[in-house]
Each structure stands twice: as C-alpha cells, then as structure tokens.
Amino acid sequence: MAPVRTASLLCGLLALLTLCPEGNPQTVLTDDEIEEFLEGFLSELETQSPPREDDVEVQPLPEPTQRPRKSKAGGKQRADVEVPPEKNKDKEKKGKKDKGPKATKPLEGSTRPTKKPKEKPPKATKKPKEKPPKATKKPKEKPPKATKKPKEKPPKATKRPSAGKKFSTVAPLETLDRLLPSPSNPSAQELPQKRDTPFPNAWQGQGEETQVEAKQPRPEPEEETEMPTLDYNDQIEKEDYEDFEYIRRQKQPRPTPSRRRLWPERPEEKTEEPEERKEVEPPLKPLLPPDYGDSYVIPNYDDLDYYFPHPPPQKPDVGQEVDEEKEEMKKPKKEGSSPKEDTEDKWTVEKNKDHKGPRKGEELEEEWAPVEKIKCPPIGMESHRIEDNQIRASSMLRHGLGAQRGRLNMQAGANEDDYYDGAWCAEDESQTQWIEVDTRRTTRFTGVITQGRDSSIHDDFVTTFFVGFSNDSQTWVMYTNGYEEMTFYGNVDKDTPVLSELPEPVVARFIRIYPLTWNGSLCMRLEVLGCPVTPVYSYYAQNEVVTTDSLDFRHHSYKDMRQLMKAVNEECPTITRTYSLGKSSRGLKIYAMEISDNPGDHELGEPEFRYTAGIHGNEVLGRELLLLLMQYLCQEYRDGNPRVRNLVQDTRIHLVPSLNPDGYEVAAQMGSEFGNWALGLWTEEGFDIFEDFPDLNSVLWAAEEKKWVPYRVPNNNLPIPERYLSPDATVSTEVRAIISWMEKNPFVLGANLNGGERLVSYPYDMARTPSQEQLLAEALAAARGEDDDGVSEAQETPDHAIFRWLAISFASAHLTMTEPYRGGCQAQDYTSGMGIVNGAKWNPRSGTFNDFSYLHTNCLELSVYLGCDKFPHESELPREWENNKEALLTFMEQVHRGIKGVVTDEQGIPIANATISVSGINHGVKTASGGDYWRILNPGEYRVTAHAEGYTSSAKICNVDYDIGATQCNFILARSNWKRIREILAMNGNRPILRVDPSRPMTPQQRRMQQRRLQYRLRMREQMRLRRLNSTAGPATSPTPALMPPPSPTPAITLRPWEVLPTTTAGWEESETETYTEVVTEFETEYGTDLEVEEIEEEEEEEEEEMDTGLTFPLTTVETYTVNFGDF
C-alpha cells in the first residue's frame, strides 16, 4: 500500500506542477483551490498511521534538521537576507501555515532551476542582507558575517542542482505536515501562529518537530532563497577572531524581524557582496564553524547583550531615528564600494578612508563618548567669598585651629601658638571627624582641593578621605563608586595643593570631607570646586557684581600680554605708547604702557603717575587689573567719557603690568589653584623685588641722630650708597631697571598692586628702633595709665597725614576693602576696619619699594593688597574688576591734589633741582629738568619755600582746596653771592680766612708771610680762571679727561701794592653783575721767588704761634686796597 500511496502523491504533485507554469504561478491557482486540493490529500491520509515510519525513513538527512534550527536562531535576525535552501525549509513552514503562500511555494518550485544558478551571486548578497539587520544593532558584525557565510554557500549550491531529488523529498514532507495538524484539527488556528512566530515548537511532538522542519522548508526555499545562518555562538567566536573592535549586536526584539524584511533591498546589496567577500575572506579561511549536534538546544539570544550595551533598541519608536540608523548601518557595508561612499559624510570618510574597521569603532565611540566634564571654579574658600560662618567642623584642637582656618593657602602667624594658625585641626582623632562647607545655594560640585598645615614645625596633612553631600545638613549621602564609598587620595606633603575630582558631579548645598588617614595630626586646608545651579537670590543679590564692560577677562601669558598691549596701542595710537623698562634675568622684557594726550614727552606742569604690578610673580590679580585698565581707558576715551578724557589729558599715566615676568611664568604653569603660597614669588635669581632696594632709612635716621639734617644730609632725594652701585653688588636685574626708570621720570604718585591680603599699606615699611628718650617717655606714660604714641610716631613719615589720605581714598572707593565684618585674610584685622595700615606696624621690613621711592625720589608710593587670593580663578576676574575699578580711577585723580608750579630765575630761565619745602613737613621735593614741581598736600594753608644753590630763597602762602585740582604756586629766585663765597672758601681749603687788622703793628716776618699769602691767592685765582675758560671753550679733542694745567713757567711778576693782575680776556665773566669786595693788606717789602704751598702753610702755623706769645715787634706802615672779583 505504501508504494501505491507514494505513487498517488507523486502524481498529484505532478498535476499541480503542470497547473502552475513558471512564469505566472499566481494566475493559475488561487488559495481556495490549493486548500481544497490539499484537504483531499489530507482526508486520504488521516486514517493511515505508517506515514510516521515513512517519515523516519525519509528523514535520514541530518543536515536539514539541524540547519532549520540554526535558522530559527538566525531567522529573526536575518529577515532581510535570502537564506540558502536549508534555511528556505524553515520558511516553507511559514508558508504552509500561511495557506495563501503555499500556492506560491510550489509555483516557485518550478522556478527552482532558474533561481539555483542565481543563488550563487545572491549568496554574496545574502550575507550583506544579514549584515544590515545586525548593523542596525551593531554595525561591526556585518563584514565578518559576510566573509564567513560565503564559505558555506558554495557547497550548498552544489546540493541545489539536483532539482528532481528535492521535488521527490518535498512531496512526502508536505504530506506529512498536512497529516500532523489534521488529527488535532487546529490547522486553522495554528497556521496564523506560525506566521507570527516562524519557529513553532509548542504544538508539535518531539518527533514531529524534526519531521516538519525537514519537510516544510523544501518547497519554500525557492520563495526566499536565503542562506542558512550559523549558530550564534559560532558566529561570535568567528567575529572575535576577525576584528576585536566589532561590537556584537545579535539581540533584537521579536517583532522586529517582520519590520526588517525589506525585500526590495536584496538586489541592491547583491552587487556589493563580491567586493566585500574579497576583502574579508583571507583572515577567515582557517576558521571553521563548530558543530553542536542535533541535541544542542540553542538558547534565545534575542534578550542577551554581550560585552557592550546597545542603545538602538531604545530608538525604534521614532521613525526618523530608525531611518537614520538604517542609513548608518549601510555605510559600513559600502566602505569598499566607491559609488556609494558619496552618501557618507565626506569628512569622516576622508578622515578614516585608510582604516575601515577602526572607523566603525570610532563611530560607536562617538555614540558612547562620555559627556565632557564640567569644569567649575572655586566656590570662594581661599578668596573669602565663603564667610567664616559658612564653615563648620566636628571639633577643633584649639581656637587658633578652628574650621575658619581651613581655607586653601591659609598662612600661620609669626607665633604658631596664637589664635591664627595655618589649618583646621581636629581635637579627637579616634572619632569620626569632618569639616563642612555651606554654599547657601544649590551647587554642582565637581572636585575638592586639599592642602596640609602651614607650619615651620609640624608636618601634618591628610592622605585619604571620604566625601559626603546633603541638602539640609542632617541627612548625608556618601559619594560611592557604584558598590562602596569612594576613597579619595589627598596630599603627600603639607604645601602642595592636590585636586580630587568627582567622576560624576553632584548637586547639593552642603559638602563634607571625612578624613580617613593622615600624617602627623589631623589637619588640613581645602578649596571646593562647584558651579551655582540656582539663580542668585536675595542673600547674594547684595554682594554679586555684574560687569557691563566689554573687556578681555582672562589670564594672559607673557605672549598674550604683549599682544594685548599691542592691540590697545593700535586701537588708540594717539594716546598710548608701549616701551620697555629693561629685561629680566631670563631676558624677558619688562613692558610698560604710557597713556597721555602727548605720549612720549613730558609736558610742563603735567604730573606723572604710575601703577606697577607683578612684583611677585604669583600675585596675578594686579597684573590682570592693569591690563583691563588699559582697555578701559582706551575704550572710554574713544567713547568720550569726560572723566577719562580729563584724566588722560591732564596726567601722564604709566602702567607696568609685570615687573617680574620670570616669576609669573613659573606660577602660571601650576595654574590658579595649584601653586602654593611662594611658587613664583621670587625672581629667577632668587630675589624678592619688593625688598631688594637700597636701604636709605638707616642713612637718614643716623644723620638725624647726629643733627646733620638738613645741613649736611638732605631730607629728600638721598643719594644711593656706593655699595649698591658697583657691578658686583647683590642687586637683582629687575631692580636696576626699575631704579633707572624711576630716575628718568619725575613721578609724583604711584602704587604697586599685590595680593594675599585686602588692605592698603603706606610707608615707612621699616621699623625704627626707638631712642632712649622715647622708651623712657613710653614707660612713664604706661605708669600713669596713659597712651603714649612716641614709639608709633617713630615709624611715621613726615608726610604721614598725606599718606593716610591717599590710602583712604583707595580703600574707601574699593567695594569690599572697608567692610569690617570680613576681617583679615590670614590673621587679625590690623586695619581696624578702615582698610589701611602702616607698613612698619603690620609687616616691618627694610629696603622696600615704598621707602626707597619716598626717600630717593619725589614719588609717594603705596602698596595695595587687592585680595586674599593671589591667583584668582578666571571666572572671578569680572567681579574683581568691578570691585577695584572705581578705586583705581579715584587714586589716580589724587595726583592733582596739593600745589604745583614752576621755579625760574629773574630772566625766566627754569631752575632744575630746586628744593620745595613746606613748613611743618620735614621732607621736600625737587623740581624737574623744566623747573616744574608737584607737591601733594591735604586741604589747608601752607607756607611754601623754594630755594636753590646760588639763588636767594623765596617763600609764599599757598592754599589747598578740597576739590580735585592743584593750586598754582610759582617762584622766581634772584641770584646770590653764596656761590662765589663758596669758591673762595674752597681756595682756602674751606678754612676760615684770617683778616689782619690794619691798625695792628706787624713784624717784618709777618709782613713777608702776608705778601706770600696774597701772591698765592692771586696765582690760584688765575689758575681757576684759566680752567673755566678751557671748560667753556668746547669739547676736548682727546678722549681723555682734561687735566689741570701746570703752573705757568713764566717768571713771577712783582706787583706794586696798588697794582692788580689785569684780566687777559673778556668772556663770560663780563655777563656777571654781582661783585663783592675783599679787603687785603699789602706790605711794601718786595719778595723774590714764590714759595710752595706747603711752605706757606708751615709759615702760617709758625706765625700763629708767634702771635700767641704776645711779643712786640717794630711798627711798619701798611696800605689797604680793595679787589673786586666777578661772581662766577
């Protein structure tokens, strides 16, 4: 019976084939006709049970049973790809359940011979089709799979040519499939299930699964003609060998395969496959897919993600995103094909054209690249924007080591055991200790900077710590690394700041540091990095400053500074000029900017003002403020700001942003928060510029003790000691350049900008040792319970009141300097809330810039300390500019307060180096080369005196008003004979000249000595006259200095008592108008040869001794005559 049945089945199949021509399969039979035909066969086979045995006999082929299973795993993922004949068997199952497609399958069977030859090229195309779905998930898998599958396809193609055999096997398989659903009668319900799920296993028996899988796929392969997919594990192993950078993307949700089945895409990819096959095949030749056998149950990999996360499944909801993903998936496949590279981004193709594999990896890296870390500025621990009451701690070792001392770069006082030490230190090290900062607003914290204790004795610092956050200071959340509290590593020494960044920012209001381990005692200083999240509310609205000036708010290197000054000069060429003071020890130029209506020239009556900064290289705020001031003055002058225009037109302003460029370059390498207190402070040679000037205080005070001032030692413009002028003197290169610059320009007022404190310091900076009288007076005052200011007065300058006025003018205009609640930056507030302090009382030191400027020149110099943070963050520059802008302008305007004028003689010729002194102030000023002077004075009435050598002094009363604007006080001096008198005294060795009384009788010896003395004086007068004539005749021809002419070889001329040596020439002496008379007594006795000067002096001494004896000599007659000398 079995042969009869098989024969009947074959006949039925042949009948179906004849009814379905190859060209038009769908036009011959409809779905209803096919169903009726199949139901007829099923009805015949329902009562027969041996078909299962036949099935077992027909099923000896193991490959079709295994491959359909593999196709199940890969079918969902490779819905777009044409599957080889084995895989088509699985799709036949799908078709059979979809009764309509069954008709198409047999029709396609007729086309098998035509499709089989075509399957070889599609094999290459099939591989790319498998790639796109995987590419959608992870494009890296596409190329490797394409290379692996081509190897399996050629052998499968050889099996296909036997079309007859396949027809013979397909017929019994189809009949068996029809027999199985009939007993249960769920065919109508189960067929749609097969459509949704291409791998039905639940409703079939264990033996039937293999049979159905082997039988059903054979009519369907002609429909889809897709290659079978390899085992998923085999594919992964092969991909690992091919390219380690490819990311596996095998999992996909079950509904996606239906969406991916884009049939029109197959022909497009087929043409591209051969090229890819050639490129990828060589590395895959030695690789063979592992065989797991029929019993191996393939797990469901659709829900698993290997090694890498895959974001694409999150995007399929949006249609546009899915389309973009598809386009991106196609790009990696089309790398090898030149015609389709045009669709890709030109820049990416050009960048990665030589590296196809890495290029895909780079695309994925861009997708998964972490967001750039937010860089936040300090919240203000070091700059004291965080107030003391915003910092708390679990405990403190003593009052001087409280939480408020835990600021970054906090400096200890001179006595480390006082109330101002250099860190926060905990009391009990056994308990959990912490220090907390309240930002008073929601803040995004990004890091913490820690530092050890500032001490010359102790070596204390924290090595590891935890970090916690809170919004209410009650509930704290520790920062973790995902599974435990994250440990941050701190310092390895006590001075170097160390940054500990948070891997991910945390938004909170409070932050705590929990030290874990430490060296020495538990002490630390810190700064917190954070960005405000919430807007500024009422509390900060009073303190926040927003600038409206369009300036360059950033830190400038040496090159940037030079470029900025050049840009300002080009923008305002009529009022600016850039020049150099000299060079540093490393050869960097010290640049200066002059701002005036006539740059480059000193105008008569126009005062000169200077701002200097960067004396210490790590004190950067002053440097940036002067660069901002340059830009501001230029912009406002061009915009017509009347205040700035008046200042520029009436003042010659000099701005030097960096006096120590070498030190700045050292400090800038570490940045604003990571340089310690002293890094970059000194020059390259190791000098502190501020304290490297000649010590003139000691010279002046020693002269005052000897009562030599102002007769032998002046009280102003003291000369520099010789030991500082020698080439071997230990003076820095920068100081030499600064002194030369100060002597060339007649500065009136100046200030040097520093950092580390918030105050204004004025001279003296050197502490003067009190005298015995002052110490005694202080002791008596203390015994009586009174305050004696004798010692404090010893530290004050004669212009103490004027210095205080100038200091207050800057501090009062500063927005934060005079706020008493802020206190001192490092220790107690020495200013008592006024923002000004005497340098000797605050920080005594010798040889400072301020003292030297006051004693050696006419310039009143002050030191301005701009803030607690020497090197503020770039984000704080706008705020600091607004805090200091008004103060900088106000202080410059003070140069026009006091008196000014010009000193000339009666002919209107200016007198240089004339001294202007004010009664009550034991310090004068000198006139400039043009005879003009400026004297800063407080409002009031003053008696001013002008005197110069060779001129008669002149005095007048000058009034100074409160308004800005100096009072004009000019002086005209008349010539005096003091110059000639000094010359005569010099001729006599600066000894008193003896005058002989004519009525007194003289001995012959006295008369002889008198004659010799007179002759000697006449000869010296002639030599002086000849010397002056030589000096005024013109420059000497020889480079050697002119020597004194030797005595005249002509014989001495004997003069009668009434004769006078006639003048040989009438030159410049005739222009002199003043004369004086000298009474000379001449004896009638004649003398022969002249005596030497030594002999005359010896005889004069003998004569004095004889006169002391009181002996009487014979009387002789004498004559008296007058000699008139021109005043030279």
UniProtKB/Swiss-Prot annotation:
Isoform 1 and isoform 2 are expressed in adipose tissue, brain, heart, kidney, liver, lung, skeletal muscle, small intestine, spleen and testis. Isoform 2 is expressed in macrophages. Expressed in aorta, preadipocytes, adipocyte tissue, brain, heart, liver, lung, skeletal muscle, skin and spleen (at protein level). Residues 113-163, 249-261 have a biased composition (Basic residues). This is Adipocyte enhancer-binding protein 1. Residues 40-367 are annotated as: Disordered. Induction: By TGF-beta. Expression is also induced by a high fat diet. It holds the Pfam family CarboxypepD_reg. Disruption phenotype: Two independent knockout mice have been generated for the gene encoding this protein, and these exhibit different phenotypes. Mice lacking exons 7-12 exhibit reduced growth rate and body weight and resistance to dietary-induced obesity. Individual adipocytes from these animals are hypoproliferative while the adipose tissue is prone to apoptosis. Mice lacking exons 7-16 die perinatally from gastroschisis, in which abdominal viscera are extruded through the ventral body wall. Surviving mice exhibit deficient wound healing, having dermal fibroblasts with reduced proliferative capacity. Residues 1-25 form the signal peptide. SMART domains: FA58C, Zn_pept. It comes from the Eukaryota. Residues 374-531 form the F5/8 type C domain. It comes from Mus musculus. Residues 77-101, 262-282, 327-362 have a biased composition (Basic and acidic residues). Residues 546-976 are annotated as: Interaction with PTEN. The gene is Aebp1. GO terms for biological process: proteolysis; regulation of collagen fibril organization; regulation of DNA-templated transcription. One of its GO terms (molecular function) is metallocarboxypeptidase activity. Keywords: Calmodulin-binding, Cytoplasm, DNA-binding, Glycoprotein, Nucleus, Repressor, Secreted, Signal, Transcription, Transcription regulation. InterPro entries: CarboxyPept-like_regulatory (IPR008969), FA58C (IPR000421), Galactose-bd-like_sf (IPR008979), Peptidase_M14 (IPR000834), Peptidase_M14_domain (IPR050753). CDD domains: FA58C, Peptidase_M14NE-CP-C_like. GO terms for cellular component: cytoplasm; extracellular space; nucleus. Glycans are attached at residue 519. SUPFAM superfamilies: Carboxypeptidase regulatory domain-like, Galactose-binding domain-like, Zn-dependent exopeptidases. Residues 554-895 form the Peptidase M14 domain. Residues 381-546 are annotated as: Required for DNA-binding and interaction with NFKBIA.
